[in-house]
Amino acid sequence: MTMGRIFYIIKADKEIIRTESGGENAMDRYLKETEMLDYSSKNIRQLIAKRKWDRLDAFRRVQAIYNFVRDEILFGYNTDDSIPASKVLADGYGQCNTKGTLFMALLRACRIPCRVHGFTIDKALQKGAMTGFVYKNAPQNVFHSWVEVYLDDRWYELEAYILDKAYLTRLQQQNSGCTGAFCGYGVAVQDLQHPVIDFDRNNTYIQSEGINQDFGIYDAPDDLLKAHHQEMSPLKTFLYRHLGRHLMNRNVKKIRRQK
């Protein structure tokens, strides 16, 4: 696979965001609750109350929620991309699309505007996390997304919440000889040992070098999935849900536990 990132500069529009005062909000559509972004769910409200994220300033709020989704919701494969945020939280694990759904729900519950950007990535990026017949039978183009967050009058592209630090650290240790580009095990970056994964008013990426198709920006994952989704036959979908993802999750756990 020749890695090549499709790069887009997305300029923030001139719409005024007033999330703290409770006044009119010109981008209310980026704060709406949806079927997938079900932030009124009991477990989501309890989590926010426990963590007290809504008491933080906007930057610290985004940073704290980002770190929670990245490191406390472990990298793993759920039953389907369309599950709601409350289910992702209950599962305690997720991948790009499902962790993104939870991230967006938590942000919107805390009055941080956000949207979703859809793509596909080459399946070579998943090699290692996927193995054997699971990898062989996986679609060549894997459905992918990241979350874009509006803060300080600009949009930030955030993707590196996908892999928890414990998993990524093990990959870095197991591939300590790699000092440049790396593609596999859920990673596609220019520099494996120094990827930009921490949010400090910057974009973060962990799979962007594997992008091979851009579907554009949508208000919510519900809208994205109405237009695009993972293309698999009914049989392959059944096998993924009931066998493939369990093998993948077992493999990911094995990597995370290795010393």
Regions found by a protein language model. Give the residues of each.
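His-Asp-centered catalytic microenvironments across diverse enzyme cores
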Residues: 32, 36-39, 121-259
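Secondary-structure boundary elements
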Residues: 26-91
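Residue-level signal for well-ordered alpha-helical scaffold segments within enzymatic catalytic domains
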Residues: 67-68, 105, 109, 145, ...
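Short, positively charged and aromatic/hydrophobic N-terminal segments
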Residues: 6-10, 14-17
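Active-site neighborhood of thiol-dependent amide/isopeptide-bond enzymes
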Residues: 78-138, 142
